[in-house]
Regions:
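Interhelical loop/hinge segments that connect adjacent transmembrane helices in multipass membrane
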Residues: 1-6, 142-145, 169-170, 176, ...
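Signature of the first transmembrane helix
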Residues: 5-62, 213-240, 369-373, 388, ...
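Membrane-water interface segments that mark the loop-to-transmembrane alpha-helix transition
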Residues: 8-21, 46, 51, 55-105, ...
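Helix-terminus/linker motif at the lipid-water interface of multi-pass membrane proteins
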Residues: 23-39, 161-164, 223-254, 272-273, ...
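Interfacial segments at transmembrane-helix termini and the short loops linking adjacent helices
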Residues: 37-38, 104-120, 307-336, 382
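Helix-loop junctions and terminal segments of transmembrane helices
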Residues: 58-74, 86, 252-279, 283, ...
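Membrane-interface junctions at transmembrane-helix termini in multi-pass inner-membrane proteins
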Residues: 77, 124-147, 334-360
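Hydrophobic alpha-helical transmembrane segments
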Residues: 114-124, 145-193, 363-367, 381-405
Length: 438
């Protein structure tokens, strides 16, 4: 893919994602003012549960499927991948549904309104069945964005129509579920039109699960904890603290999610370049992605520190002023998260370093969990936000160590020079060998 075409595609993807944030800018203050702190806390807790179920249903299938589709040579091969992944996700959806019901009854916040938890579980299953990975693997980058914008518009109309007061939290989940089902109908209809009907089967599910386990372990160590932070806080603190943390986390999630559009273009491109033997081109594309992500991480770090005390109370109201302090703690996470996104997505996934990702992901998840269990009961929302920062920082340290050991440091802008300076300062001989790559 030439540079000009890449810029156009990335620009279109970011323009589509702009609709996501316009949507959130509308609904987040609407939720805060219409539902209040307690009602909004229930919505945030249910959305956290939805994200956990989403991760369980997805189970690392998306990056594996995207990687396989990027290398596919025919429609028949794509249909075979499509059929296998749909079969596996249906099975995982049944398991995720059972887990969601149990989690609903165990949460003091959600058990008071169990229907919200049920709707959140169904929404997580529907979200986990999405086909964005298929479109990205086939380099149809614009298609999932158009479908997603359609879903946002539909849910926005439903939310603004149905949510009228503090007791209408259930209609938020119902609106999101209807929009998710409608978007899935469109995406599956388009894929079936292009590739044919999926052939559901049990054969091949176990090998797919085995191949996806390493990436799932990475996501379960970091991403699942990230998605479940609000739910964990419902077990350790009060609904008010859940509301303060959830509001700040939502803004942090918005900032972090802006890394996603570029990844949707860079990761399939790097994967295809490596599959075609264009190692030099893959390295160049990787460095471009690194520069973009790291610059963005520093930008949102400065913005969150400086603007949080003014922006959050203005958008959510004075009652959410404690959320601004939580977001300022989250700000220290952004540079680490940008580096982690680059190494995991742009370096390791295209080069099939799944096992290494699993090891560091599990270690980071344990650090996250231990820090949260220690800090959340004492400091509430600020404690669990600090635990997230600690987890991301430790993940960055581990990923950097692996990159150096694999001699892939040349893919990090300025990494080779910085490592050489550290070695000279420590009295070691400078490394002169060129970077190796699979």
């Amino acid at each position: 893919m030439d540079r000009r075409k890449s810029v156009r595609i990335i620009g279109f993807v970011y323009a589509g994602y702009l609709m996501r944030y316009v949507y959130l800018i509308i609904v987040v203050p609407f939720y805060g003012r219409m539902l209040g702190v307690a009602g909004y806390g229930r919505v945030l807790a249910s959305m956290s549960l939805m994200n956990v179920i989403w991760m369980l249903v997805n189970y690392g299938f998306s990056p594996v499927g995207m990687r396989d589709v990027s290398k596919a040579q025919s429609v028949e091969e794509c249909n075979d991948i499509f059929s296998l992944h749909v079969s596996a996700r249906i099975f995982h959806g049944l398991v995720g549904g059972c887990i969601g019901l149990i989690a609903t009854m165990c949460s003091p916040v959600l058990s008071q309104h169990p229907l919200i938890g049920v709707l959140a579980t169904l929404l997580g299953i529907v979200s986990g069945m999405n086909l964005g990975w298929m479109f990205q693997g086939r380099h149809q980058f614009r298609t999932p964005i158009v479908i997603e914008v359609f879903g946002f518009l539909l849910s926005l109309v439903l939310v603004l129509t149905l949510v009228k007061g503090p007791n209408d939290a259930i209609w938020v989940l119902a609106s999101l579920l209807v929009a998710g089902v409608a978007s899935s109908v469109v995406s599956y209809g388009l894929t079936i039109y292009q590739l044919g009907w999926p052939r559901l089967r049990l054969a091949g599910i176990v090998p797919l699960v085995r191949n996806s386990t390493m990436l799932f372990l990475y996501s379960s160590g970091s991403v699942v904890f990230t998605a479940s932070s609000t739910y964990l806080l419902t077990l350790l603190s009060t609904p008010e603290q859940v509301g303060y943390f959830g509001a700040a986390e939502r803004f942090a999630t918005i900032a972090l999610a802006l890394m996603g559009p570029a990844a949707q273009v860079f990761i399939p491109t790097i994967t295809r370049q490596l599959a075609q033997g264009d190692v030099q081109g893959a390295h160049q594309t990787t460095r471009h992605g690194a520069a973009l992500l790291m610059a963005y991480g520093l930008l949102i770090f400065c913005g969150a520190l400086a603007l949080s005390p003014f922006v959050l109370p203005l958008i959510l109201g004075a009652s959410f002023e404690p959320s601004s302090h939580v977001l300022q703690i989250f700000a220290w996470m952004f540079p680490f998260a940008a580096f982690n996104e680059f190494v995991a997505g742009y370096v390791f996934v295209p080069r099939k370093k799944d096992r290494l990702l699993a090891v560091v992901g599990i270690a980071s998840g344990l650090i996250n969990l231990i820090a949260a269990l220690i800090l959340a009961p004492r400091y509430g929302a600020t404690g669990i936000a600090l635990a997230r920062v600690i987890g991301e920082a430790m993940l960055s340290v581990m990923l950097m160590g692996v990159v150096i050991r694999l001699e892939l440091i040349s893919l990090v802008p300025g990494g080779t020079r910085a490592l050489g300076m550290v070695r000279v300062a420590c009295g070691f001989r400078p490394e002169t060998r060129s970077a190796e790559d699979e």
